[in-house]
Curated annotation (Swiss-Prot):
Family of the protein in this entry: Belongs to the methyltransferase superfamily. RNA methyltransferase RsmG family.
Localization per Swiss-Prot or TrEMBL: Cytoplasm
The gene coding this protein: rsmG
Organism: Staphylococcus aureus (strain bovine RF122 / ET3-1)
Protein name, as recorded: Ribosomal RNA small subunit methyltransferase G
EC number: 2.1.1.-
Length: 239
């Protein structure tokens, strides 16, 4: 009854799961576990844990940010599709692009999107650093990333993709506050401004989460993002 558990949790936030959405989440779980046996998509495979720590965790940002509008989203380093695919299931009008550096994960996502019959999704095999220099630079309403690197690094990978007036939605676990302090210099250099922070608990004491909404106020200087690997090795920090 795990999908029913998810439905109950979302109902507390006035979100109703349709039968189609329930079926999509069940299919998502089955495909995730099946493909995980041949490639490393996630260390979390217990059914309830997937619903709690992947599906619910991916949808939770919608409690604080209005995804129920026709916006374009780019998800950087989404791995097995988190948070953007659960958000797409919940809000079908979203236009979703996922950028991931591992081609095997892109193959999984293509198969998943086909099985879930998702429209307006595209999956691109690229490094965020090179993707942020190309034609998609400053073209997305929202760019999201879920804890793939420290916030100072994530900002350099994500803010160049956000259009002026758009938002970077960063999802972190409990140590986000100290990362935010460290990242403020990079965020400013890259044209961003932190406008909202939200701290919330996952159900069943599964951990604290933090969400930062960063508005793109100015264009990102052309030299960012720097070449692949550099943001991680030498993050933009105040001297």
């Amino acid at each position: 009854m795990t999908v029913e558990w998810l439905a109950e949790q979302l109902k507390e936030h006035n979100i109703e799961l349709t039968e189609t959405q329930k079926q999509q989440f069940q299919t998502y779980y089955c495909l995730l576990v099946e493909w995980n046996e041949k490639m490393n998509l996630t260390s979390i495979t217990d059914e309830h844990d997937v619903y709690l720590k992947h599906f619910y965790d991916s949808i939770a940002p919608s409690f604080y940010f209005d995804f129920n509008q026709p916006i374009s989203i780019c998800d950087v380093g989404a791995g097995a599709g988190f948070p953007s695919i659960p958000l797409k299931i919940m809000f079908p009008q979203l236009k979703v692009t996922i950028v991931d550096s591992l081609n095997k994960r892109i193959q999984f996502l293509n198969h998943l999107a086909s099985e879930l019959q998702l429209q307006d999704v595209s999956f691109i095999h690229d490094r965020a650093e090179t993707f942020g220099k190309g034609v998609y630079r400053e073209s997305y309403d929202v760019v999201t990333a879920r804890a793939v690197a420290r916030l100072s690094v994530l900002s350099e990978l994500c803010l160049p993709l956000v259009k002026k007036g758009g938002q970077f939605v960063a999802l972190k676990s409990s140590k986000g506050e100290e990362e935010l302090e460290e990242a403020k210099f990079a965020i400013s250099v890259l044209g961003g401004n932190v406008t909202e922070t939200h701290t919330y608990e996952l159900p069943e004491d599964a951990g604290e989460r933090q969400m930062f909404i960063i508005d793109k106020k100015r264009q990102t200087p052309k030299k960012y993002p720097r070449k692949p690997g550099t943001p991680n090795k030498t993050p933009l920090l105040e001297k």
